[in-house]
């Protein structure tokens, strides 16, 4: 009897990942099961932590750092439908248009944006640490001949302080504990505490900061605004697999938890008063990726009174705009550290929203859109001719520089285009792939065939001069069985096209000398009957 492993079979479902991502996108647009609200410059976006953490290293660190890698508790008795609360995240350092494009990318695997908004999307992808979007935007900008903008130091500093503030608040909430016997951990809002006063030099301590929360009064669940139709549920296997695709990044976990572990002590009921105390610690210069400057933060502080205000309903026009965006889900997010997976992602097909043509390859959809808009951003500096693609401009510049990169291996001939070399190779190989459908003559080049069809050496004459001659030319009697065959006319092969071709050439050659001489019957029979057919024959008979 075989082992249990021998009885196992694997049934793949290739469309499952895209269908799962499509369902998550539909839930996001309807506001169902969303456990996070992102605010930026007065606009709000409902989304899921698991999807954001799977696509963005920044969000993964924001949701897990200091929380042991667990998902933030949402069972604190919020006022949203379904008895669940939703976290609120303020990201004023990312513009609404760029954030909307990145959220659409996270749920549809398609980055849809305009060429003018490409630098803003690149800046937002750098702040949120989305490697595949950064690589695609850099490739598009470099292909367009534009220089990628440098990261904004103020936004980088605000993003760093925002992340550190959440890590500090989460660590403190975990150490404060919860009384035994209480199953659900309290909801900790995602709104950060007021940032510490700016220091002359931005540093980060080598040791973790010592911070704690002081609680007063009732439970802090009222700090979380109401969210319509929000339900919480444990992560499914597919969502856990999607979150785990990014793996470990940079040493610090990218986390999604802001609640103490189950079974810990609960703080006393009352609004949370965040006070961070830092001890004397050894400091060193912060190690951060190149290009991320350090500057003083100008982010305004948020008081507890402002955080406790009621949430305004989402603008219906905004929901209609989000619903109208491209929704075709193809594949979930990929591991930015895996080059092979990133290469496969760059080859994912994208659909044109205008003509619905499937475009393959990253960065080719904006290039295809220029065919609809008529935009030609690449201009020749010599003659001023404009092109929609940069590679076409480079090929055009060879006409001015004299460069001929395609050389024949059999002779010294060089060519400007690859198809010219391909046609030239027929001369060496003897191949004649272009055949005339009238006279069956073959040619090595297509332009030779076109010249043959338009010239005087084929059955169908199409020159303008021939049409004028046809009007003034005398009408000769049509060919019949009694017409004598001109010299050199071969009718033995039985091809009607060849006969018509030879006959047309014969009439054309005899047009200058007059009509041909025809006989009414065979000369031998006429001589036997004694009926002269020509003046010379009559004179011969009279003399005889």
From Swiss-Prot:
What turns on this gene? Expression in mammary glands is induced by insulin.
Subunit description = Homodimerizes. Interacts with NCL, NEDD4 and YBX1. Interacts with HNRNPU (via RNA-binding RGG-box region); the interaction facilitates the recruitment of long non-coding RNA Blnc1 by ZBTB7B. Interacts with HDAC4 and HDAC5; the interaction allows the recruitment of HDAC4 and HDAC5 on CD8 loci for deacetylation and possible inhibition of CD8 genes expression.
Which PROSITE patterns does the record cross-reference, listed alphabetically? BTB, ZINC_FINGER_C2H2_1, ZINC_FINGER_C2H2_2
Implicated disorder: Defects in Zbtb7b are the cause of helper deficient disease (HD) or helpless disease. HD and helpless mice are distinguished by the virtual absence of peripheral T-cells of the CD4(+)CD8(-) major histocompatibility complex (MHC) class II-restricted T-helper subset due to a specific block in thymic development. The developmental defect is selective for CD4(+)CD8(-) cells; the maturation of CD4(-)CD8(+) and gamma delta T-cells is normal indicating that lineage commitment is specifically perturbed without affecting positive selection.
* Residues where Phosphothreonine is found: 373
Q: In which tissues is it expressed?
A: Widely expressed, with a higher level in skin. Expressed in thymus. Restricted to CD4 cells (mature single positive CD4(+) and intermediate CD4(+)CD8(+) cells). Expressed in the luminal epithelial cells in the mammary glands where is up-regulated at late pregnancy and lactation. Expression is enriched in brown fat.
Query: What is the location of the Glycyl lysine isopeptide (Lys-Gly) (interchain with G-Cter in ubiquitin) cross-link?
Result: 210, 216, 339
The record's section on CDD domains has: BTB_POZ_ZBTB7B_ZBTB15 (cd18327)
Give the protein name, as stated in the record. Answer: Zinc finger and BTB domain-containing protein 7B
Q: Tell me where in this chain the PTM Phosphoserine is found.
A: 150
Localisation: Nucleus
Q: Where is this region: Disordered?
A: 171-221, 244-314, 465-493, 507-544
InterPro entries, sorted: BTB/POZ_dom, SKP1/BTB/POZ_sf, Znf_C2H2_sf, Znf_C2H2_type, ZnFinger_BTB_dom_contain
Q: Where is the composition biased (Pro residues)?
A: 186-200
Q: Name its species.
A: Mus musculus (Mouse)
Q: Provide the coiled-coil residue spans.
A: none
Q: Which domain of life is it from?
A: Eukaryota
A GO term for molecular function? cis-regulatory region sequence-specific DNA binding
> Quick one: where's region Required for interaction with and acetylation by EP300?
348-404
Provide a GO biological process annotation: positive regulation of SREBP signaling pathway
**Residue ranges of every copy of the BTB domain listed in the record:** 34-115
Q: Where are the zinc fingers (C2H2-type)?
A: 350-372, 378-400, 406-428, 434-458
Q: What does this protein do?
A: Transcription regulator that acts as a key regulator of lineage commitment of immature T-cell precursors. Exerts distinct biological functions in the mammary epithelial cells and T cells in a tissue-specific manner. Necessary and sufficient for commitment of CD4 lineage, while its absence causes CD8 commitment. Development of immature T-cell precursors (thymocytes) to either the CD4 helper or CD8 killer T-cell lineages correlates precisely with their T-cell receptor specificity for major histocompatibility complex class II or class I molecules, respectively.
Question: What's an example GO cellular component term for this entry?
Answer: nucleus
- For bias type Basic residues, the affected ranges are 201-210
Briefly explain the null phenotype. Mutant females are unable to efficiently secrete milk lipid and to nurse the offspring. They show normal mammary gland morphogenesis in puberty and alveologenesis in pregnancy, but are defective in triggering the onset of lactation upon parturition with large cellular lipid droplets retained within alveolar epithelial cells. Mice are more sensitive to cold temperature, with impaired cold-induced transcriptional remodeling in brown fat and diminished browning of inguinal white fat.
Sorted alphabetically, which SUPFAM superfamilies does this protein's record hold? beta-beta-alpha zinc fingers, POZ domain
């Amino acid at each position: 009897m075989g082992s249990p492993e021998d009885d196992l079979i694997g049934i793949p479902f290739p469309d499952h990942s895209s269908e799962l991502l499509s369902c998550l996108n539909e839930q996001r647009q309807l506001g169902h099961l969303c456990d996070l609200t992102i605010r930026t410059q007065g606009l709000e976006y409902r989304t899921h932590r698991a999807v954001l953490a799977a696509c963005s290293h920044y969000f993964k660190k924001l949701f897990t750092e200091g929380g042991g890698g667990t998902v933030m508790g949402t069972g604190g008795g919020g006022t949203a439908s379904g008895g669940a609360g939703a976290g609120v995240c303020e990201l004023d350092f990312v513009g609404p248009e760029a954030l909307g494009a990145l959220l659409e990318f996270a749920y549809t695997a398609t980055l849809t944006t305009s060429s003018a908004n490409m630098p803003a999307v690149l800046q937002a992808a750098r702040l949120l640490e989305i490697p595949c979007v950064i690589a695609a935007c850099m490739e598009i900008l470099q292909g367009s001949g534009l220089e990628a903008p440098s990261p904004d130091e103020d936004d980088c500093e605000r993003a760093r302080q925002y992340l550190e503030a959440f890590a500090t608040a989460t660590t403190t909430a975990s150490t404060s504990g919860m009384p035994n016997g209480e199953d659900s951990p309290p909801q900790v809002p995602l709104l950060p505490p007021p940032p510490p006063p700016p220091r002359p030099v931005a540093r980060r301590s080598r040791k973790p900061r010592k911070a704690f929360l002081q609680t007063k009064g009732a439970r802090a669940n009222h700090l979380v605004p109401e969210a319509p139709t929000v339900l919480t549920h444990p992560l499914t296997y597919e969502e856990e697999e999607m979150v785990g695709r990014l793996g470990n990044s940079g040493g610090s976990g990218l986390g999604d938890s802001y609640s103490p572990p189950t079974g810990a002590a609960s703080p006393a009921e009352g609004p949370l008063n965040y006070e961070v105390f830092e001890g004397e610690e050894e400091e060193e210069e912060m190690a951060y990726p190149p290009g991320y400057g350090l500057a003083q933060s100008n982010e305004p502080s948020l008081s507890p009174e402002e955080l406790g205000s009621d949430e305004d309903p989402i603008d219906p026009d905004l929901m209609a705009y989000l619903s109208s965006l491209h929704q075709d889900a193809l594949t979930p997010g990929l591991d930015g550290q895996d080059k092979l997976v990133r290469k496969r992602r760059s080859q994912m097909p994208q659909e044109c929203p205008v003509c619905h043509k499937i475009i393959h390859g990253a960065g080719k959809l904006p290039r295809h859109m220029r065919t609809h808009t008529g935009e030609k951003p690449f201009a020749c500096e010599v003659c001023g001719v404009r092109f929609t693609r940069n590679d076409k401009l480079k090929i055009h510049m060879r006409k001015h520089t004299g460069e001929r990169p395609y050389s024949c291996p059999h002779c010294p001939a060089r060519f400007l285009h690859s198809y010219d070399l391909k046609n030239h190779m027929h001369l060496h190989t003897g191949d004649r792939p272009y055949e005339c459908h009238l006279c069956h003559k073959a040619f090595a080049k297509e332009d030779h065939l076109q010249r043959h069809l338009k010239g005087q050496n084929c059955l169908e004459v199409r020159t303008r001069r021939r049409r004028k001659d046809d009007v003034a030319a005398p009408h000769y009697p049509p060919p019949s069985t009694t017409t004598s065959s001109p010299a050199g006319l071969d009718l033995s092969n039985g091809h009607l096209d060849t006969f018509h071709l030879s006959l047309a050439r014969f009439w054309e050659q005899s047009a200058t000398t007059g009509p041909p001489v025809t006989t009414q019957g065979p000369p031998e029979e006429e001589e036997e009957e004694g009926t002269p057919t020509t003046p010379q024959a009559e004179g011969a008979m009279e003399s005889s």
